[in-house]
Regions:
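N-terminal/edge-of-domain interface segments
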Residues: 1-147
């Protein structure tokens, strides 16, 4: 995501995104090993959320640290995430957070999760809680401590 000065390397070929959902053909929770040290974790995500699922906790991003603690971001439409197509409007309607253009009237969300200092990141989890919701993890970057 060049505009935000946060590097995400997304492979052109092969699997480059993972989605969670309550639908039978998706996992409702995934955990991705990270095992890197940094001061923040930047996560690029996108969601498809039915309007009937707004104003409730749709999912959660969790950064697990090597000391057993974690940092959570609750994904709640429209407070911290919204539908990637803006529910047909083509415009983000999220109330907070940082929408990022994915091109052609689509958008995702950039989350910068502060770790409270230089910490070892064990993994990142994504979990979906509501029906008629798909949440995708498009990229993870650990931001190193400034030198």
């Amino acid at each position: 995501v060049v505009d935000e000065r946060i590097p995400f390397t997304i492979p052109v070929e092969g699997d480059n995104a993972v989605f969670t959902s309550m639908y039978d053909n998706f996992p409702d929770r995934i955990e991705i090993p990270v095992n890197e040290r940094g001061r923040k974790v930047a996560v690029l995500a996108a969601a498809s959320i039915s309007l009937m699922q707004s104003r409730m906790d749709n999912g959660r991003l969790r950064v697990n640290l090597s000391d057993g603690t974690h940092r959570d971001v609750v994904l709640r439409d429209p407070e911290t995430i919204d539908d990637w197509l803006g529910s047909g409007t083509g415009k983000p309607y999220v109330l907070a957070g940082h929408p990022v253009s994915l091109g052609k009237n689509a958008h995702g969300h950039l989350y910068e999760i502060d770790l409270g200092g230089d910490r070892m990141v064990k993994s990142v989890e994504l979990e979906t809680f509501t029906n008629e919701t798909m949440i995708g993890l498009l990229g993870i970057t650990v931001l190193q401590a400034e030198k």
